[in-house]
């Protein structure tokens, strides 16, 4: 008997979040403008199965509100924002943006999605760190 590997179908919104994290990471490491990052991303990435409108909104709005997002999460970090791993920083910024501004998305969905994205892109225990921070941020934003 052979074991069949069952791949979960990744939702268009999950793919949008993954793309937004990648774009935020690129923005952070390249220091290029968000508009330039978005333009390059849209031209160069395979966006099949991605909710591109949601990706664009997440990336643009997270970048635009980065100072507010950072100020929300700073009290719950164990280090300076500048010392965070760039991937963890991108994931946390995106999730905190969603918790604060995307009120139609339940907080549990935001946290779960951030954990799943951290499992894909982050270091071995990134998902635990992301979960710990977001679990403290959500109640402060009256989302829990």
UniProtKB/Swiss-Prot annotation:
Q: Name one GO biological process term.
A: DNA-templated transcription termination
Named from the GO MF annotations, one term is: RNA binding
Q: Name residues in a coiled coil.
A: none
Which keywords are on file for this protein?
Answer: RNA-binding, Transcription, Transcription antitermination, Transcription regulation
Cellular-component GO terms for this entry: cytosol
Any single Pfam family the record assigns to this protein: NusB
Q: Which InterPro entries match?
A: NusB-like_sf (IPR035926), NusB_fam (IPR011605), NusB_RsmB_TIM44 (IPR006027)
Q: Which HAMAP family match?
A: NusB
Similarity section: Belongs to the NusB family.
Q: What does this protein do?
A: Involved in transcription antitermination. Required for transcription of ribosomal RNA (rRNA) genes. Binds specifically to the boxA antiterminator sequence of the ribosomal RNA (rrn) operons.
The name of this protein is Transcription antitermination protein NusB
Phylogenetic lineage:
Bacteria, Pseudomonadati, Pseudomonadota, Gammaproteobacteria, Pasteurellales
Gene name per UniProt: nusB
């Amino acid at each position: 008997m052979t074991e069949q590997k069952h791949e979960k179908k990744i939702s268009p919104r999950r793919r949008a979040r993954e793309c937004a994290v990648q774009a935020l990471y690129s923005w952070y490491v390249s220091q290029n403008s968000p508009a330039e990052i978005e333009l390059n991303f849209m031209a160069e990435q395979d966006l099949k199965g991605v909710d591109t409108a949601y990706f664009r909104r997440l990336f643009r709005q997270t970048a635009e509100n980065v100072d507010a997002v950072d100020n929300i999460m700073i009290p719950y970090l164990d280090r300076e924002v500048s010392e965070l791993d760039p991937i963890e920083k991108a994931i946390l910024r995106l999730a905190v943006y969603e918790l604060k501004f995307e009120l139609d998305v339940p907080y549990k969905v935001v946290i779960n999605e951030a954990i799943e994205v951290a499992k894909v892109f982050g270091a071995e225990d990134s998902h635990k760190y992301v979960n710990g921070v977001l679990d403290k941020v959500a109640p402060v934003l009256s989302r829990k």
